[in-house]
């Protein structure tokens, strides 16, 4: 299943060292999620502390487990939307498939 996840980071004030440690752990965890094929894309919302991610997970429980593993989870306001394939995507996939088959 694919999900659009909006994550608003509300990390409190803390020492620079502690903030750097948490941010480093967050980057490392995100890289692991990318390597596992769970985190597909991650974008910023300009002018905010919000990120929007495209995640793939087997089900909502797996996604919850992934998100709750984020080092900043306790400070995030998260909204999740399940995604369905748009008919245009199906047409594009079919067109690519037929082009590859004839090449």
Predicted segments, located by residue:
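Conserved, structured core segments of small domains
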Residues: 1-103
